[in-house]
Amino acid sequence: MRKWILTRILPTLLYRSCFHLVCLVGTISLACNDMSPEQTATSVNCSSPERHTRSYDYMEGGDIRVRRLFCRTQWYLRIDKRGKVKGTQEMKNSYNIMEIRTVAVGIVAIKGVESEYYLAMNKEGKLYAKKECNEDCNFKELILENHYNTYASAKWTHSGGEMFVALNQKGIPVKGKKTKKEQKTAHFLPMAIT
């Protein structure tokens, strides 16, 4: 007797479950038609993409951040009034205040606020400063898991490897050819101006 009841009821239960599922999906797609994927995920209580990837709105273009770039070697990146790039340990030095402008997704240009020079890297990996922004001034900004950022030339590479902005233990710029993402000389904290 039980076998007959299950055989008769099971197709009805499956049909109703599928019907409810189709109605639910259809309702969600109609309600979320004008929403971005992030908004849709949030509205249907799914895990949002931010939960799995790090979302940084400022990396999407047009944003300007004013920061001091503090290297893990204990030096602030500085561009002086003559356009010389080096490190300083003076926190309150006006030449270490940088304007970090987003050029494209993950690409930034770094400009000294006081000196009005842009940070640039040539094909040999040497850091220098320019009054006018060009492709040499574009850097790929990467946020590492240790909360430091790296800045690699968006234009130049060396033997297939990226060339990074880096300051050695004496605050002297390291040529990009000698840098790697894992080196602490290439790790910077963008510190808010206080």
Swiss-Prot record:
Q: What Gene Ontology cellular-component terms does the record carry?
A: extracellular region; GABA-ergic synapse; Golgi apparatus; postsynapse
InterPro entries per the record? Fibroblast_GF_fam (IPR002209), IL1/FGF (IPR008996)
Q: Which SMART domains match?
A: FGF (SM00442)
Q: Where does the secretion signal sit in this chain? A: 1-31
A GO MF term: heparin binding
Q: Which family does it belong to?
A: Belongs to the heparin-binding growth factors family.
Its annotated function is as follows: Plays an important role in the regulation of embryonic development, cell proliferation and cell differentiation. Required for normal branching morphogenesis. Growth factor active on keratinocytes. Possible major paracrine effector of normal epithelial cell proliferation.
Q: What is this protein called?
A: Fibroblast growth factor 7
